[in-house]
From Swiss-Prot:
Localization of this protein: Cell membrane
Composition bias type Low complexity, residue spans: 854-870
Name under which the protein is recorded: Plasma membrane fusion protein PRM1
Claim: Transmembrane is one of the keywords in the record: yes
Cellular component terms (Gene Ontology): mating projection tip; plasma membrane
Similarity-based family: Belongs to the PRM1 family.
Topological domains, Cytoplasmic: 48-108, 322-403, 633-1026
Location of region: Disordered: 693-777, 793-812, 818-879, 904-952
Record lineage: Eukaryota, Fungi, Dikarya, Basidiomycota, Agaricomycotina
Entry function: Involved in cell fusion during mating by stabilizing the plasma membrane fusion event.
Membrane topology term: Multi-pass membrane protein
Database matches in PANTHER family: PLASMA MEMBRANE FUSION PROTEIN PRM1 (PTHR31030:SF1)
GO biological process: plasma membrane fusion involved in cytogamy
Amino acid sequence: MSTLAQPPTYDATTTADTQLTPYLQLSHLLSLTWLAYPILSLIFVAFRLQLSMTSLENSILSVKSDILSSCKAAEHAATAAASMPRYMALATNEQFADAVNGSLHAARVALVVSLTAMEAIINFIIDTYRSTFFCFLELVVTGGLAVLISAVQGINTVLQSVTGSLRTSIQSDIASANSVIQNAINAINKVNPFGNINAPQIAVPSLDALQNVTLPASFQDALTSLNASIPTVADLKGALESIIDTPFELLKTDINDTFTGLSFNSSILPVPEQNRLSFCNDVDLSVIDEIGRDFIKIAKIGVVIIILLALLLIGFNCLLTWYKWRCMKRHLEYTRQAWNTDPTMIHTKTSSSSPPQVILTDHNLMILHANSAHPLITRIMNQLSARLRFSPSHHTNLRWFLHYIFHAPALACFLIGFFGLLSVEIQLLAMGPIVHKFEDSAAAAVSDFSNVIAASINDSMFNQSALYANDINSRVDVIQSTINNGVFGWVNSTTFTLNATINAFYTDIQKAVSTVFNGTVLESPANDFIKCFIGGKVDAIENALTFLHDNLQIDIPRVNDSILVLSPASVHEATAPIAAAAIGGGPNDKEGLIGRLVKAYTATLKKERVMFGLFLALWGIVVLMGVCILIWNTYGQALLKKRRRRRYELEQRSGINGIVVPFRSGVESENEKGAVLDLPSFTPLPSPRRSAFKPFWGSRSNSPMGNQPSGSAESFAIQKEEWDDFPPKPIESTVKKPSRLMAIGRKAMGKERVKADGGEESTSSSSEKSPSDEGIRSTTWVGKFTTLWTKKEPVPQSSEFWDQPSRGRPKLQINVHRDSADAGPNLYSSHTMQSRWSASPDATQTSWGKVMSPSKKTSTTTTATFQTPFGYSTRKSGVPIHDLDQSYDSLSSKSGAPASLPLPLYHGFSGSQSRPSARAEATTTERKDTSPPPPFAPYRTNKLPNPPYDEQRRTSTLRVMNPTFKSSDHTVAMPASRLLTTMDARHSSAINPFITPFDDEHRVTIDNNPVYVRQSIPTNPFGVAL
C-alpha cells in the first residue's frame, strides 16, 4: 500500500506572514452559504422558469404573427367569398342569356300561334255571325221578295182576270143592251110602226186596256232584280276573311321580323369586378395578450417566490453554518475532554496543551468524518433510535441508508427534481383556471371576427350585386321597349284597322238592308234587326280591340339588387371556418391558435416535468440500489453463509474415520454431529475438501493475526447473521470449578442479572426476556413499529471450517523467565480497556481466562488489572460519563495490588480444559474470533489487585483501541466484563447502544480547572442540518 505524501516541514523559528489558516473559518464558510444544494437547485429551477417565460413570450409573438398571417389568408379566402358574385355572374349571364333567348323565341312562337288562333277565332265568330246572318237574311229577303213577286204576279193575274171579265162583262152588257134595244126596237119596230126604228146601238168598247191591267212591271222587275242582286254566303265569307286576316298576317310578319333581330348575348352582359377585402386591421388580439400576460405573470411570481425562498434559505444557511461552526467548536472541546477523561487513554503529560497520545483508526476517523459530513442525519438517527429503541443493526443500517441516499450528488438530483416538479405542477394547476377564464373570451373573439368578415363580405356583395342588377335591368328595358314598340306596335294601327273593318262591315250590312228594303215597310224592321243582332257584337269587338290597344304590352321582370347577395346563414357558414382558422379551431373553436398556445406551453412544461422526473428517477435508482444493498447485507449474505454452512455440514456428517462422538450432557448442540467434535486438543483433523467458496490459503480465521473486524460498523454488522447481533452481547468467562472454565453463551449472558453487590446471578428460565427486549416493547406503538424492523433471531449455527477459531485449543505461551503469577492477561492486545468515543468494535480477542480454566466451578468472576502512570486519576470503569457530577468524584487514584487469582499453566491443557458450550462456540464463530497465544507481559513485582465492585456498568457500542503505554508503576483495576467489551443488557442499568462520548448524555463538566473549563451544552455537536 502506497503511503500518502507527507506535509512539508518547516523550521520552528519560521513565522507565517498570513492570517489565513489551512482550513476555512466561519467567515469563509458564510461567504459560501449561497452555494448550498437546495439554493443551487432553486436557482436551477428559477433559470428554467425564466427560460420558460422567455419561450412563452416568443410563443406569444409567434402566435400573434401566426394570427396575422392566418388573417391575411382569411382575407384572401374572404376575398374569394366576396368575389362570388363575379363567378356567379359568369355562370348566371350564360344561363340568363339562354333563358332570355329561349323566352324570346317562345314568345315569338306564342305570339304567332296566339295571333293565328285569334285570327281563326275571330274568323270563326265572324263567320258564325255572318253565316247566321246571311242565311237568315237570305231567307228573309229571298222569301220576302219571292212573296212579293208572287203577290205581284197574283195581283196581276187577278187584275187581268177581273179586268178581262169586267171587259167581257161590259162588252156583253153593252151587247145585251144593244140586243135589248134591238129587240126592243124590233119589238117596237114591230110594234113601232114607225118603222123600223133603228135601234140605236151602243158601241161596244174594246176594253183591251182592261185586259192588260197589271201591276207596274218596274215593281216586279225591281223585286226580281233585288232577288237576283242579293250576294251569296260564299262570297261574303271570303270577303270577311280577307278583311280580318289581313291585319293578323301583317302582325305575324311584324312579329317575326322583330324577334329575328332580337338576341340576348352573354358576352355583352356585365361581370362584377373582383373586390379585395381588408379586415385584419380590425382583428382584436387582446385575448392573446391577456392570456400571455397571465402566463408570464405566473412564471414571474414563481421566479420571485423562488428567489425569495433562495434568499431565505441563504439566511437560514448562514444561521445553520454559524450553528454548525459553533457545534464544531464545542465538538472539538468535547473530543478533548473525552480523550482526557477516558480511562483507556494513558497519557504521559498532565497539561491540557499537550495532545493525548491516542491511536486514531481509519474506522474512527471515518465515523468522525461521516458525523461531520452529515450531522443532521446523525442527530435525527440518534433521536429516532432513542425514541423507537432501534437495535444496533437497525440503527447502523438506517443511518447508512440515509447517508447513501442523501449523498451530495444524489441529494442534488433529489432537490432539483423535487423543486422542479413542484414548480411545473403548480404551473399546470394554475393553467386550468386561466384557460377556463379565456374560453369565453376566445369564443367571443371568434364570433366578433366572424361578424367582421361577414359584414365585409356582405358590403362587397351588395355593391357588386347592385351594379350588376342595374346593368342587367337596363338591358332588359331595351329588349322590353323593342318588343313593346316593335312587336306590339301593330296594336295602335291594327285596332283602328279592325274597328274600321268591322264598322265597314256593319255599314255595308246596313246599306244592303237599306238597299233591299229601300222605301218598303220592311226597311225599318230590317235595320232594327241588324242593329240588334250585329251591332252589339261589333261594339264588343271594338271594346276588345281597345283593351288590346291599352294593355297589350310586355313587362319583363327586373333583376333585384340583392340577386348576388348570400343569405346571412350562408355568409356565416362561409365565414365561420375562416374565423376559426384565424383565431380558433376545432369543433368548439378552442383548438385554434389560442389553443395551440396553451398546448405549446403545456408541452414545454411536460417536457420539463420529464426532465425533472428523470432527476427524481436517478435519485430513485440510488434509493433502489441502497435498498438492494441493505437486503443483500441483511439477508442475502446470511442466506449464502447458511447455504455454505449446510453444504459443509453435509460433507462433515460422517465425522472422523466414521467415529461419531456423542454429545456431552448439559451442552447444547445445533445438529446431530455438533459444530466441533469432542477430540483431544492436539488430535489432527482431516483436511477439508476444496470448496468453490473457500480457498485453502489464509483467511481471517486462520491468519496469524486472528479475525480482524472491518473498519466500519457496517462491515462489522455484515459479519453477524442477524441484525440484533450488533453490537455483540458480552461473553463472560466464569470459573465454576478450579478444573474447568466454561464460556457462557451469548443467550445465557443475556439472561444475567446483577445483584446489589455487583455479583452475577444466572437464571435458568428460558422464557425470561432481557431488559433490552422489555424496554423495546414497553409501549404498544413502539412494539408494533419495531416489529417491522426486527425479525425472530434464529438459532445460531456453526460457522464453516474456514472461520472456526481454535478456541478449544488455546495457543499457550510458556514464560521461563517469570513465575506463573506474572503470566496474566495480555495487557497490550487482548485486554485493553474500551474507548467510549470509538464508534465500532475493534478486533475481539478471547479472554485469557478462557485459556486458563480454573478447576472449581464455584469460583468468582476472573478479573484482570493493568497499571496507569502515577498521578493520573481514573474513574470507576462501570460509571458512564453522563453519571459524572461537576467533579471527578468517581475517579480515584489507586495503586497496584497483587493478583487475587494466580492461574497455573497446566490449566490450559486438554486434560483440565472445559469445553465451551455450543452456544458460546456459535457466538464466537459468528464473531470470527481467534485465540492467538498471549504475548509476554511486562515484568511487575506487584500483584493484580482485586477488582472493584461493578457498581454501575457502562455500556459502549465500541471496542477498545490499543493505547500507547509508558512505563509506570500504577495499574487500574478493570472487571473482566469491561475487558471483554460486551454489551449485555443489565437489569441494574438502562442500556442505550447508540451512546457515544460526543452525545449529550456524555457531556463532561470540569470544575475549577482553567485548563478544562468549558460549558456543558445539552446539544449534539453533530446534530445539525446538512
